[in-house]
Every structure is written in C-alpha cells, then in structure tokens.
Amino acid sequence: MNPTKPSIWNWTQPQQDVPYILAISIGVLLILGLSEFVKRKGVSQEWSRKTAHIGAGLLAIPFPWMFKSVWPIIILCSSFFLIMLISKSMNFFQGVHGVKRKSHGAFVFPLVIILVFCLAQDPLHYAIPIAVLSLSDAMAALIGKRYGKHQFHTLGETRSMEGSTAFFFPTFLLVHIPLLLFTDTGRTECVLMAFGCSILVTAFEMISVRGLDNIFIPFGTWYVLDNYAAYLPEELAYRIGFMFILFIFFVAAIRYHIFTRTGAVGGFLVIYGMLSLGWDGFFIPALSLFGPLLAAVILHHRFGRERIPPMGVSHTFQSTIVAMLVLLIFDNTKQSWLLYPFLTASSAGTIIIALRIVKNMSLYRLPIILGLSTVSPLVALYSETHHIKDVRHLLIAWVGTLTAISIYWYSTRFQAILICPKCQTQTLERRHCGIETQILSGHPFFTQARIGLISIFCATVFCSLWVSQYA
C-alpha cells in the first residue's frame, strides 16, 4: 500500500530529518567526487556528467518515503543549486560543467525536484518522473553519443534516432513496472499508460535543448501519469490510436518537406495537447483547420515553383503557443468564453503556416485566409458546443483572426532578410546550407516566426478583452 502524503508545508519534527539530510549531503559530495574522478581518468565528458546526473537522481527518488515535509528537500536542493552556481563561476567540478554545449541542466535539476515533489499527490507520481529523468535521459545521451548514426538537429543541437529509441524503452519499463507492482492499476491499463507516457515524454526529449529536458521530461511524465490515472482502458486505447494517426500524418509531412523532424514532433505534441486540454468543445473546431491547411499543402505540391524550407520546431511552437496558453487557462478556470480567443489564436496561427507554404502563389492567398478564418468558427457553431453563448462573439473571433493576419502582413516589411554566405541565397531562415545566415536587411529581432507570434498574441488579447466584457 502506498503511503499517504500529509501536508508538505508542515515541518513538525525536523530533528528526525537531520540524519537523512546529512546522509544525502554526504552522498551528493561523493557523487560529485566520483564524477571528477571519472573525468580525470580520461573518460569522456558525457560519461562523467551523466555519472553525477544518475547518482543525484537516484538519491532523490526515495524523498517521499524519507521526508514528510517539503522543507528538507528545499534545504537540500537549494544547497545543491548554490554549489553548482559557485562551482560554475570558479571552474570547479568540471566533470559536471565541462561539457562544451550550452546547458542549464545542473541548475534546473534541483529546482525541478522541489516542484515535482510539491505537485505529485502520490509518491509514485514523484518517483517515476525522477527515475525517468535520471536513467532514461542518461541512457539516451550515452547511446546517442556512441551509436547515433541517424542524426537530426533541433535549435542548433544534435539528436539521434538511436538516442531517442534508447530513451523510449527504459521509460516504458520505468513507468510500467512500478504501476504494475505497487498500484491497483490493471495490467491492460499499465501497458497502455506506460506506452502513451513513453511516446509523449520521448517526444519532449527529442525537442529539448540546453538542459531544458530536465524540465520537460519530469513534468511531462508527471502530467501524463496524473491525467491517465483517471482514464478507462477504452479511453487510453482511443488516445493511443489518435497518436498513431498523428504519427502517420507527420511522417507524410516530413516526406513532403513541410516539417523538419523536430518540427513534426512539435506539431505532434501541440495537437495532442489540444486534444488533452480542450476536448470539451475546443478540439473539434481546431481539428477542422486541417482541411484548408492540407489544401494549401496540396496546392503547393501541385503548382508551387519554389521549394519552401521545412518548418522547424521554433516555427511550429511560435505559431501555436498562444492557442495552447489559452487552453491551459481554460483547463484551470473552465471559463467558457475562452473559446473565442482560442479560435482567434488557432485560426491565425494556422493561416500564418499556410501563407508560409504558398508564399509565392499570390492567387491562393486570399482564399486561404478567408477559408481558414471562417471554417473554425462555423464548425464551432454547428457542432453545438455548449460554450457558444452568443453567435456575435464568433464574429469577434473572426475579426480577431483577420486583425492578427493584418498585423502580420504589415509587419513583414520590417522582418530580417538573411543571406547565405555559402550560396548567396536570400532566405528568412537562421540557417542555410548547414551554416548560420547573415542579415541583409531589416531588424534582426523581427524574424518571421516572431512577427507571427506577436501578431497572434496582440489579436488574441484584443479578442479576450472584447469578449470578456460580455461574459
């Protein structure tokens, strides 16, 4: 039987925790010393870093069974954070800090432990995410470094399919075995939960850079476990089936050079996130945007004369992040009027993606703008969602979408035009021919993706302020 968790903010018997605090502190120092020893023996930097990563994670896993309060964990993790900060500035512990790439993982790791401990209502929902972060992430890095042949790039960092595969299988076991042995969850549910969680967390790992996987992996694992625990086997099977459909769609999108691999992974996470957060009246209108977007892809494939650069993960997220934020607010507040700014943000983001696809086909721009701005409000209206309180608010959402596109269209005159030093091709992309591009004209801040994000945000705020007055 799992131990129940009392109020984590009450520290009634601190003297009982002192031996544990001292033991863990000594353990951390020994792990850092071992990492330095491994580095000085000539072992690769990645191995010495992951030695500390695995050791610190294994020390943190039993915290819910050792401590009744969060305060000892705050003391331990804050001390570790300060040690990492001071050692970084003084060039100590190069077994941890000596990695060549930019990484904030050593500083994020202790903060994440505190936050996951505070969020998790079940000890296993804390222990499993920390175990995945400690073991699966280390396995992915080491296998990818040694055997990674099929490489791809995400925001300047290199990943490999071998490393991601090495992340998936340990994650499946780390989720499946504890649920099977220490909970009342049925066998079928355990397999489905572990499979779905492994897919989603592996996707997060593929697009995380600069040590931010130390945030996305544990929070993603915790969130999926916390939500999947309430689902019946049929619901879990339905969601995994939807993942499979998305997988087929984005494989085709990669095949036709619409997305890069990481851009497709980002799109997969965004759409699945919309399903998870906004099934209640939000998801079907958002899903309807795929029809006109697919039409834009087909038009470009049939009649486009210039091959467009595939969309990366930054373009994907900057076109959809505002809609996802609206959904997160709805998930916490259940305010039905948020449907309208969501329609504005999702429609505008999809239009910007479509305009990028048909940028040299001016004949089709206006039909795409009108089609994509209209289809989502109409589907919301005729799907008879209970969130529709006033049809006039749909008109506000439609005006908000056109406002976003107008801001975007006007602002593109200020965007940075870049040139590739190697082939002298003008482009809007930060990288071309495998190297960094140089600014030819415009302001470096106003990239195409940032202009799109600013336009969507402004129009969504406009729609929210207008509709909220009548909510």
Language model: regions and residue ranges:
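Hydrophobic alpha-helical transmembrane segments
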Residues: M1-G42, W47-F93, A106-T154, S160, ...
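Short acidic (Asp/Glu) patches
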Residues: F93-K102
